Design a protein with these regions (language model features):
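Short, structured segments at the rim of ligand-binding sites
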Residues: 1-422
Length: 422
């Protein structure tokens, strides 16, 4: 099992190019189940979750051709299509549930394994199931599988999500594209991966989707979607991770291929810690401060209201080095402080009270052997090791490989002493 060896502290300097967005690419790939025509998706990140989704589509009957060093995929439908998404392909990836909506919309039946992914809270699928039930889906769960059918074409409906859910919003939008009539979705997630990418992709293919309010989406069903080519947006969380790295390590970093407007909340927080930030259309130039300022009362919330939950762990590492006490409240997931125990091994002084982390600053990290627990926690451990004194070993980095494209190569180019060991 691979691990990282990092020798710190490291100074970050140079430039990094952001890969395509995993969280945008996954629902776009799942939605290709709706198509009879060829679809070409460009700017894919080369990460494990993308490989898993592509393998799932291949298993279901799509013909897959990789181009441009696997950053582009050409997807063509075979005549024979399966409606069974097995546990072996869905168990490692939360986004596996996203094939349920398009399969029901296209084929009116599906047997889909309950999904896996990072073990950060319950992350219930009931939001997906309750929404798809409104379209006319009938289902039962047996032995870890969702057995679903519909009596012919799905019917447009009105749905107000009881909680804002990224996955349920995506599944509902995708399913509604081929449903009969009009669908109104209220209290939708409006992350850029949905609003700027999934919907743009589907509309380019002939779907009829528009926003009628801040969190209200209208979809008019169509009979079919046309052949299309689309390039996935840059990865918002990778961008945020590198922004934190530069701030943490007193760096001077130019981040390319990402629209800074899509991460403005996090950039504003980094400015509060003392970072100097200049932006242009698709670049961020960030310089870390000599002394990091603390921040009180950060709360993770749904986009765009506050810090993204996927960047909470990275910001916690940054605040360990700040000049005073900081707090982070995690309001999205109930079990997303699993990185804290590992940060304590490096010397962090963090107290957890329910869903709030109280972080004492001025921590001198000392290298240690660490264990990754999930994707974003793994990134946080890498950041901490970069500024720790001495050698750190990070185990179970397969979590990182699920969401970051060759992160060690990118870090090495900007000054980090990092090696992958097998």
């Amino acid at each position: 099992m691979d691990k990282f060896l990092i020798k710190g502290p490291c100074k970050i300097k140079g430039q990094v190019s952001i890969s395509g967005s995993k969280n945008a690419a996954l629902p776009i790939l799942a939605s290709t189940i709706l198509f009879d025509k060829t679809v070409i998706i460009e700017n894919l990140p080369r990460v494990k979750d993308i490989d898993t989704m592509v393998n799932l589509l291949k298993y279901l009957g799509s013909k897959i051709q990789f181009l441009n060093n696997k950053k582009t995929v050409k997807i063509t439908k075979n005549k024979k299509q399966k409606i069974f998404a097995p546990y072996s392909l869905v168990k490692t990836m939360r986004a596996g549930i996203l094939v349920l909506g398009p399969m029901i919309a296209k084929y009116h039946k599906s047997v889909t394994s309950l999904p896996g992914g990072c073990l950060i809270g319950a992350r219930p699928v009931n939001y997906h199931l309750n929404a798809l039930k409104k379209f006319g889906m009938i289902y039962e769960i047996k032995k870890g599988y969702i057995h679903a059918t519909s009596k012919g074409k799905l019917k447009g409906t009105n749905i107000k999500f009881s909680n804002i859910s990224v996955g349920a919003t995506e599944n509902s939008i995708i399913a509604a594209c081929l449903a009969k009539g009009k669908t109104i979705l209220k209290n939708c997630a409006i992350e850029p991966e949905i609003k700027n990418d999934l919907i743009n992709f589907l509309n380019k293919a002939g779907a009829k989707i528009k926003w009628t309010g801040k969190r209200t989406c209208q979809i008019i069903g169509v009979n079919s979607l046309k052949e299309t080519k689309y390039s996935v947006m840059g990865d918002r969380i990778e961008t945020g991770t590198f922004c934190v790295a530069a701030t943490l390590a007193k760096g001077d970093l130019l981040i390319k291929n990402f629209n800074p407007k899509l991460i403005q909340t996090e950039l504003n927080l980094l400015k509060k810690t003392g970072a100097t930030i200049k932006t242009s259309k698709d670049e961020i130039h960030i310089k870390g401060p000599q002394k990091i300022k603390n921040i009180s009362n950060i709360v993770t919330k749904e986009y765009p209201n506050s810090l993204a939950t996927d960047l909470q762990a990275q910001f916690m590492v940054l605040l360990c080095k700040a000049n005073g006490r900081s707090t982070i409240t995690e309001s999205i997931f109930e079990n997303r402080f699993m990185h804290v125990a590992e940060l304590r091994r490096l010397g962090a002084k963090i107290i957890i009270k329910d869903n709030k982390a109280i972080i004492e600053g001025n921590t001198e990290f000392l290298g240690a052997e660490l264990m990754s627990s999930d994707l974003r926690a793994s990134a946080a451990l890498v950041l901490a090791a970069i500024v720790a004194k001495g050698q750190s070993v990070i185990n179970r980095i397969y979590h990182l490989d699920r969401g970051y494209e060759k992160i060690e190569n990118k870090l090495r180019k900007i000054g980090v002493d990092i090696k992958r060991l097998s």
